[in-house]
Structures are given as structure tokens and as C-alpha cells.
Amino acid sequence: MSIRHGLLALLDQGPRYGYQLRTEFEARTGATWPLNVGQVYTTLARLERDGLVVPAGEDDEGHQFYAVTDAGRAELHAWFDSPVPRTNPPRDELAIKLAMAVTVPGVDVPAVVQSQRRHSIKALQDYTRLKGRALAGETRPTATGGTAATYDGTGADLAWLLVLEQLIFQTEAEVRWLDHCETRLAQRAEIEQARAAENRQNDPAPAPAPRRIGRRRTTA
């Protein structure tokens, strides 16, 4: 529940209203997982229902601020102290697609793998380019489409770099997995060809059709 706890982490630094939370969440993650304001306020309503945040007044413009409670702070610290569970991994669309493709007749599975590899390699190149620009001190994109201050290796910039590097490592692993899938597919094709050849050898040859022998006609 990263959004829920991400908002608690921001509120632990002081009261904020919905749009501020959205902007700061996206700034710290490099807008990798964009949020809409409605999603933020829906999450805040659930946090308030669970006693983890409380309304903290409004400003002159009518923005409703929220503050974290002691219970919310305790849940946040428990989240930081606990490993992310991997026993129930989130759904992965690519894994589901390939699992279905290999079981549905008529799907060109190698073509699916090759298409995904091209896309993943392009994404990997883009992520690597962004990392190079950040480390070179260039500006980085923001959630609103503008640019942030130059990367200085601290605060939100460091948070964004960590997220970016996670995407790089994740995409590298995905490309390696796609290579592995292609190897598996080639092995399966070889096994199927060997079985087909064996079946042809084991099939008994069809018996020759009996030759029809007619009686010789005699003439008087």
C-alpha cells in the first residue's frame, strides 16, 4: 500500500493538503507513478476513517489540511521497519500475457517476446539517459512538465535517483528474463520436433492393398 504509507510519510513532516501531497509524492518519485488529486483525497478519507490522520484546519484559500496522528506515525514506522512481502507478488501483466500466449493455439509467442524486448530495451535506454543527465547536473522533469533544480544528490533528487535506478535494474532483469523465455521456447520447439519424428518412426507402415486376381476367361 505504497500510496497510503507515502502520504503518511509526507504528513509526518507536517500538515499538508491534497494538492501539496500529490506534488511532493511525484517530486520524490520523479513522477514515475503519477497520482490524481481524487486518488489522494480518497486515500486521505480512508486514513481519517482508520484514525491515522485528522483534519488540521484550512488556510485562507479553503485548502483542507491533514495531520498525522500517533497511530498513523506508529503505522508509518512499522512500514519502514518491515520488509515488503514477496510471498504474494503483485500481478505482472507481461508474465500473465506470456503465460496465456504459450497456452493459446495460434499465438506467435516468439514474436510477442521479441516485440516486448524491443520495447524494454528502449525503456532501459531512456532510463539510463535520464540517470546520466541527473548525475551530470542537468535539470530533471517534474510532474507538471517543467524542470526541477539541478540534481545535487540530496533530498528529493536522491529519492528520484533511487527510483530511477530501481527502474533500470528492474528493466535489465526483464530483458534477461525475456532472453530466458526465448531459450525455453526454443527448447520446447526442439522437444516437440523430436516427439513428432519419434511418432512417425513408431507408426506402423500401412499394409499394402491386396492385389485383386480375377479368373481367366476361357473361350469356347
Identify the residue ranges that each predicted region occupies:
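Amphipathic alpha-helical dimerization/coiled-coil segments
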Residues: 78-134
